[in-house]
C-alpha cells in the first residue's frame, strides 16, 4: 500500500469513528421527558460546561452523554497516582511496554467505575423529569450510560491506534466544534440585540486574534543551551541545535479545565442548598458574583503550578542530563542544575498562567461591552482545546508522513 493511500485510509477511518461517536449523542435514554429537561437545564452553568466535552449530551441525556469524560478523569487520577504511589511509578518507568499496558488496563477499570458512579448520579438527578422513576429505570439508565461511555472509550483507543491523532482529544474537539453554531446563533441572531451584524464582525475579529495569540503561546518555548562532554573537548562554541526546550505553557489546557470545573460547582450547589446564609456566600462565586473572577484567576494559577509539577520534574531532567554526559553552561551538575531549572519553570508557569488569565477573562469583558450573554461557551477552555488539538494532530500527520518516507528509503 502506498504512503498516500495509507494516510488517506487512516483519515477516513478516523472520520468514520468520529461520526459514530457523534450519532450516539442523539439516541436518547428512554423514560425521560427530554423537552421538559432541556428547558430546565438550558441556562445551567454546570450543564453548559459539561456540554463542552459531551457535545450537548448532558442537555439531551443520550446514551453517549458521558462521552470521554470518565476516561479523561481516570487518566488524570492515574497521572497523579504514578507520582504518589512508588509501585505505580516503578511500573511506568522500569517495566517498559508491559508496564504501560498494565497502567492502561487500570485506567480502563477506573473509567468503568467512574462512569457507573456518574450514571447513577444522573439517574437520580433527572428524577423530576422521568415518567416512571423506579429501581428498574435506574438500572436501565446506568447500564445505557455506562455502556455508552465504554463504547466511546473503545472508539477513542481505536482512533489512537489505527487512525490519526489522539482519540480522546479528537472526540472533545468534535464536541466543541459541534456546539459552535448554536452559540453563534444564540449570541448574534437574537432579535433583542441591536447592531447584531456589527457585534458579530467585532467578535469574529477578536476570536481570530485570540486564536493567533493562543497558537503563539502554545508553541512558545524557552530554549536552555546544553553542552555535552564530547562537544566541550572539541570546541568552545556552543552548538545552536543542542538545547533543552521548556514550553511556556507546560500545563496546556488542563489548568483552565480544572478551574472551570471547580467554578461550576457553586452554581450547582445553589440549586440544592436551602440555607440562606450559605446561598449568599455561594452567589459570590457564581458567574455574576463579585468574587467569581478573582477566585477563577487564583484557581488557574494554582492548577498551573500543580499540573506543571506533575508533568515536569527538574530532578528527573537533571538526572537524565547527567546520564547523557550533558550539562547547562556555567551551571554545576546536581542540585545547582535542579535549582536553576526550578526557577526557570516557576517563571514560565507564571507567564503561562498570566496568558490563561487573559484568554479566560476576554469572554467576560466582551459580554460586559456588547451585552451578549452566550460567549463563555466560546471562551478560553474551548479555544485552548481547539488550538491545542489542531496543532497536535497536524504534527502527528507530519510525523507520520516523515516516518513513512524514512521507511521507504531504508527498504
From Swiss-Prot:
Describe its partners and assembly state: Component of the plastid Sec protein translocase complex, which is composed of at least SecY, SecE and SecG.
Q: What stretches pass through the bilayer? A: 11-31, 52-72, 111-131, 135-155, 163-180, 197-217, 253-273, 291-311, 349-369, 377-397
- What are its GO biological-process terms? intracellular protein transmembrane transport; protein targeting
- Topology within the bilayer: Multi-pass membrane protein
Q: What is this protein called?
A: Protein translocase subunit SecY
Which PROSITE patterns does the entry mention?
A: SECY_1, SECY_2
A Pfam family reported for this protein in Swiss-Prot or TrEMBL: SecY
User: Which family does this protein fall into?
Assistant: Belongs to the SecY/SEC61-alpha family.
- Subcellular location, in the record's words? Plastid, Chloroplast thylakoid membrane
Q: Gene that codes for this?
A: secY
Q: Which domain of life is it from?
A: Eukaryota
What is the first-listed, main subcellular location in coarse terms?
plastid
Q: What is the lineage of its organism?
A: Eukaryota, Rhodophyta, Bangiophyceae, Bangiales, Bangiaceae
Keywords attached to this Swiss-Prot or TrEMBL record, sorted alphabetically, are: Chloroplast, Membrane, Plastid, Protein transport, Thylakoid, Translocation, Transmembrane, Transmembrane helix, Transport
Question: Organism source for this protein?
Answer: Pyropia yezoensis (Susabi-nori)
Protein role? The central subunit of the protein translocation channel SecYE. Consists of two halves formed by TMs 1-5 and 6-10. These two domains form a lateral gate at the front which open onto the bilayer between TMs 2 and 7, and are clamped together by SecE at the back. The channel is closed by both a pore ring composed of hydrophobic SecY resides and a short helix (helix 2A) on the extracellular side of the membrane which forms a plug.
- Mind naming one GO cellular-component term on file for this protein? chloroplast thylakoid membrane
Amino acid at each position: 500500500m502506498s504512503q498516500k493511500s495509507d494516510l488517506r485510509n487512516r483519515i477516513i477511518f478516523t472520520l468514520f469513528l468520529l461520526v459514530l461517536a457523534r450519532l450516539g449523542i442523539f439516541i436518547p435514554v428512554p423514560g425521560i421527558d427530554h423537552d421538559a429537561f432541556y428547558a430546565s437545564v438550558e441556562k445551567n452553568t454546570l450543564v453548559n460546561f459539561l456540554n463542552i466535552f459531551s457535545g450537548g449530551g448532558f442537555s439531551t441525556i443520550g446514551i453517549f452523554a458521558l462521552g470521554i469524560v470518565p476516561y479523561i478523569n481516570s487518566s488524570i487520577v492515574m497521572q497523579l497516582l504514578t507520582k504518589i504511589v512508588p509501585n505505580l511509578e516503578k511500573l511506568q518507568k522500569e517495566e517498559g511496554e508491559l508496564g504501560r499496558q498494565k497502567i492502561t488496563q487500570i485506567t480502563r477499570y477506573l473509567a468503568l467505575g467512574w462512569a457507573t458512579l456518574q450514571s447513577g448520579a444522573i439517574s437520580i438527578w433527572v428524577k423530576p423529569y422521568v415518567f416512571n422513576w423506579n429501581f428498574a429505570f435506574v438500572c436501565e439508565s446506568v447500564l445505557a450510560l455506562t455502556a455508552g461511555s465504554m463504547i466511546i472509550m473503545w472508539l477513542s483507543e481505536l482512533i489512537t491506534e489505527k487512525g490519526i491523532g489522539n482519540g480522546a482529544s479528537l472526540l472533545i474537539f468534535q464536541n466543541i466544534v459541534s456546539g459552535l453554531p448554536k452559540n453563534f446563533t444564540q449570541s448574534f441572531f437574537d432579535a433583542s440585540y441591536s447592531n447584531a451584524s456589527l457585534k458579530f464582525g467585532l467578535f469574529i475579529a477578536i476570536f481570530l486574534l485570540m486564536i493567533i495569540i493562543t497558537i503563539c503561546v502554545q508553541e512558545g518555548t524557552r530554549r536552555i543551551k546544553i553542552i555535552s562532554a564530547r562537544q566541550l573537548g572539541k570546541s568552545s562554541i556552543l552548538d545552536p541545535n543542542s538545547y533543552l526546550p521548556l514550553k511556556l505553557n507546560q500545563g496546556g489546557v488542563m489548568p483552565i479545565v480544572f478551574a472551570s470545573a471547580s467554578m461550576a460547582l457553586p452554581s450547582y450547589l445553589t440549586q440544592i442548598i436551602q440555607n440562606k446564609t450559605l446561598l449568599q456566600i455561594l452567589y459570590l462565586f457564581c458567574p455574576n458574583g463579585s468574587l467569581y473572577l478573582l477566585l477563577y484567576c487564583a484557581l488557574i494559577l494554582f492548577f498551573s503550578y500543580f499540573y506543571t509539577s506533575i508533568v515536569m520534574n527538574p530532578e528527573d531532567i537533571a538526572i537524565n542530563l547527567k546520564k547523557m554526559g550533558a550539562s547547562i553552561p556555567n551551571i554545576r551538575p546536581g542540585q545547582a542544575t535542579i535549582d536553576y531549572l526550578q526557577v526557570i519553570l516557576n517563571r514560565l508557569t507564571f507567564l503561562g498562567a498570566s496568558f490563561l488569565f487573559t484568554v479566560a477573562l476576554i469572554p467576560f469583558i466582551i459580554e460586559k461591552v456588547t451585552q451578549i450573554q452566550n460567549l463563555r461557551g466560546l471562551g478560553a477552555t474551548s479555544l485552548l482545546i481547539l488550538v491545542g488539538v489542531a496543532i497536535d494532530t497536524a504534527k502527528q500527520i507530519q510525523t507520520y508522513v516523515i516516518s513513512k518516507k524514512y521507511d521507504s528509503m531504508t527498504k
